[in-house]
Swiss-Prot record:
Interacts with snoRNA U3. Interacts with MPP10. Component of the ribosomal small subunit (SSU) processome composed of at least 40 protein subunits and snoRNA U3. Involved in nucleolar processing of pre-18S ribosomal RNA and ribosome assembly. It comes from the Eukaryota. GO terms for biological process: rRNA processing. This is U3 small nucleolar RNA-associated protein 21 homolog. It comes from Schizosaccharomyces pombe (strain 972 / ATCC 24843) (Fission yeast).
Amino acid sequence: MPFAEKKRRTYENAVKPLRKSRIYAPFRSIGHVSNAVPFDIEARGTHFLVTTSVGNTFQTYDCEKLNLLFVGKQLDKEITCLKSFKDFMLVAAGSKIFAYKRGKIIWDIDVEQEHGTVTHLDAFGEWIIACTSSRHVYVWKHASKYSVPELHTTFLPNTNADITSLLHPSTYLNKILLGFSDGALQIWNLRVSKRVHEFQEFFGDGITSLTQAPVLDVLAVGTISGRIVIFNLKNGSILMEFKQDGQVLSCSFRTDGTPILASSNPIGDLSFWDLSKRRIQNVTYNAHFGSLPKIQFLNGQPILVTAGPDNSLKEWIFDSMDGAPRILRSRNGHYEPPSFVKFYGKSVHFLISAATDRSLRAVSLYQDSQSTELSQGSVISKAKKLNVRPEELKLPEITALSSSNTREKYWDNVLTAHKNDSSARTWNWKSKTLGQHVLPTSDGTSVRSVCVSCCGNFGLIGSSKGVVDVYNMQSGIKRKSFGQSSLSGKPVTAVMLDNVNRILVTASLDGILKFWDFNKGNLIDSLDVGSSITHAIYQHSSDLVAVACDDFGIRIVDVQTRKIVRELWGHSNRLTSFDFSDTGRWLVTASLDGTIRTWDLPTGHLIDSISTPSVCTSLTFAPTGDYLATTHVDQVGISLWTNLSMFKHVSTKALRLDDVVEVSAPSVSGEKGISVVEAALNVESNAEDEEDISYRTMDQLDPNLQTLSKLPRTQWQTLINLEAIKARNAPKEVPKVPEKAPFFLPSLKDQSEATVPKQPIATEISKPTAVASIKVSGTEFSTLLHGNDDDAFFEYLKSLGPAKIDLEIRSLDAYPPYEEFILFINIMTRRLSKRRDFELVQACMSVFTKSHEDVLLMHDTPEDTVPVFESLKAWESVHKEENQRLLDLVGYCSGILSFMRT
């Protein structure tokens, strides 16, 4: 079929539009630590808790080990302020303030929407204060922890300058300080809503931060010009003044007895000032990648906590002789959106992710503290010596990655290609460090693709001019090269090797897929797919290669036959990533058109299509099939989606190409998401899939096909051999009579004789009369046998056990005129002629002939047995005909198979 027709292909049996995704449900987003919103530290006795904002929710860590304690409930808008207050965590988002307790919302208050969003938040005593973007100040009074705060007052300072900082000075009853962008500092009384005093001439520049000193009436005022003013609030005098590079974003006083003041600037530097000597002590450059909106010393400890929009939270300890801090512990993630993600190994414990921030990270799905960045050496110390930023000394951005966990304990097992770099780098996963080998291309051009063999011994790199070099991962020695004799001059966009290192598959931008003998090094075959290949992946369990092309199509190639077996069309823009499912049955693709589509490869149908808020840049399917992990252009985290097909039936009916479901991305808290346990216990089905789920297999596909009863094999085998089984299970010895008990202990025999009354001996009745009395009531077996519904009879027969069926057959009326014999033989003959329940019919007739053989042969008069023998002859005729038909078919198939084997 021409490509144009395939692009226009529609499915006549496509179902109606979906309301939600069939396969995927958002689970949670991982890899988030902090953003530009200032954090909050809460003292709980001798322990400290630090809370950071991550978009629409917050995370709380224990400062002792930086373990993640809990995540707050997701909000509709992004968080702007955090403040701990009594047992609550106050969170401002938009025009509302929410009170959380252990991650759950207890109550909320709000400001008028026309006054803008909340920009500053503070709380002390019974007061809660919020400043808005329109310079309005709201004051609430919180009477008790069980009540919702009541609005006390609202006031608007008489100035056109914006409020830039808010602080409650210690011991100043009902007072707050407001810092403004024009350099003014005002004291306000909350109870009467009046300005008490204003300091205008002391600072000049706009105030950016206010920090309370350990000494009463003293605070540090930071300005936009970099001035740090130590100001006495009581007498309105400047005690000392410092000047740093860049504006002052935050200040903090050390409270363990050492007179040190720390300050931060927008480029991530930390400055430490000796207050006793009134000079700078040292500067820590590039403490963070980007600004530091807040820094704070832990009360009474030489530990400084910092966090910023570089998605990192750090604790610095001052234990060196020169007073310079060192990192005590930290939690961090990518500070730029990841561009590549892949599950490591055969489990879902770790993800490997790479981003444009030039870092390679191991992200744990089990515990946040296990996530770490793979070290690139002493980058920070080298940056200090060269006076450059650390990211400038890191390796270029990673463009391709491959790994194998087979030899991870012995040598490097991760291989990466870097942007505009002519060498690939090895990494050691066990030590989480950069490896010792640098693998250059033989033609000197940049590396475009990499591959690590399944055995972990070989690393393959594809160059920009069509050459593939093979290196030993243990020694870093080059072993062979492919492509010099048939140099295409086009970049090798994918290098793939099968499980046993027998066939090497390469893809290039000229649209040629080449198959090489890996051991001999010669070209076996090549396949032109008709369009430039941008990427390709190998599915080892099924020997399939998926190829993404410039014409927005995906081709599925069988490595054994070297032919295109499927072509998938539906994306309207370039493909960014794709991956096979764990079973190889599905292919999940992502494109710049904003959709993630799932294709069923056996049928070639589109079975799921979702649209995410931002474009997916990379995706990977879990080796266990539990999750789908995705990265997006505007998110520093990694999104996890639960695979619902692990816990319920998923319809594979074709969808229309324009049937796309808009879904929300997974949240950090997992709010409105479906976990693996929830998916297993409570999963709702789509309405359009109910019909497909309730489908039942037909009783018989075709009248010419022999159909079995679908009973377990042991059931009809036991029925045939029931007498032998009973004989085998019979006791070999006669039960022994128990010894006579002492005279003072009654025996069981005595008890039974004493308790069970003797029944009168019944008078002997004739055998025909006894049988007649039994047949009066009848059984369900006998009732259905006398009826006209063969299907109902066999359904009841299938519900019985082997012993019950044997008993019912033996209980057939064995006296002239043998009516039940005739009915039983006839119903079995009709069932056999319909070619249904073949093995059950054979087993029942075998039991019937064995059980009643003596009755059929020892008859009284010929007239009584004529109808029975006529029924048996009819059975014999049908039985011989059907057996001969089956023998002919089996013989034919056996002959064909023997011919094909030879």
